[in-house]
């Protein structure tokens, strides 16, 4: 990814010089910087995980904010549960944010026209659960068995890498779980992320 990102940076600088007052050019720079940060984190997957005990709420809020700016106003995201003060888990913030954004993006893609996405939090003694639900088209039983297979996709334009990579980040890197909690065709889908609380929390 290094060379394409460098090329994007160069083009962004050219645009910034040519259109210094354009409101979208700074946003482009922020997105490129963010892409570089995520790429750097991905390169470290497979090495020793560097997880920290952090509040989950700001990570989820950042993911929602990022997606809201990029979706139709016909789709709502209910994140009222994120008004809670603190939910501390072991995490790597940039990677976890990418996973949540990927789930939100999939939810948006599943909705035709108007619809709703809901984030809910649950917890037990050892774990915090994040549920991302949508009112989209749902996933049939045959597809459900394959959604985490690398290269499998039900989209016309897609590589089939998002969910497998998200699962790897959560399960191998965070020591948690990413699963399809439920899905019904014509009703919607819920994915669940399970993350560990710090020991002695």
PLM regions and their residue ranges:
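Conserved catalytic submotifs in the C-terminal HATPase_c
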Residues: 76-87, 125
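Detector for a conserved hydrophobic position within an alpha-helical segment of the HATPase_c
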Residues: 170-171
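Conserved DHp (HisKA) dimerization/phosphotransfer helix of two-component histidine kinases, i.e.
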Residues: 7, 22-73
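Short conserved segment of the HATPase_c
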Residues: 139-151
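Glycine-rich ATP-binding loops of the HATPase_c
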Residues: 174-182
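Short alpha-helical Gxxx[C/S/T] motif in the catalytic ATP-binding
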Residues: 162, 166
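Acidic ATP/Mg2+-coordinating residue in the GHKL
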Residues: 134
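Short beta-strand/loop element within the Bergerat-fold HATPase_c
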Residues: 114-126
């Amino acid at each position: 990814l290094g060379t394409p990102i460098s090329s994007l940076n160069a083009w962004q600088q050219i645009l910034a010089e040519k259109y210094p007052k354009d409101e979208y050019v700074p946003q482009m720079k922020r997105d490129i910087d963010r892409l570089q940060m995520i790429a750097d984190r991905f390169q470290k997957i497979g090495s020793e995980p560097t997880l920290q005990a952090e509040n989950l709420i700001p990570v989820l809020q950042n993911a929602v904010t990022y997606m809201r700016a990029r979706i139709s106003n016909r789709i709502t995201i209910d994140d009222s549960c994120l008004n809670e003060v603190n939910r501390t888990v072991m995490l790597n913030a940039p990677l976890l944010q990418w996973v949540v954004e990927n789930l939100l993006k999939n939810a948006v893609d599943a909705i035709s026209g108007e619809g709703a996405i809901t984030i809910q939090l649950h917890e037990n003694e050892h774990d915090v659960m994040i549920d991302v639900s949508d009112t989209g088209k749902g996933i049939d039983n045959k597809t459900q068995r394959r959604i985490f297979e690398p290269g499998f996709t039900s989209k016309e334009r897609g590589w089939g890498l998002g969910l497998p990579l998200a699962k790897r980040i959560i399960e191998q890197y965070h020591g948690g779980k990413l699963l399809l909690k439920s899905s019904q065709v014509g009703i919607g889908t819920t994915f669940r992320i399970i993350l560990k609380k710090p020991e002695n929390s």
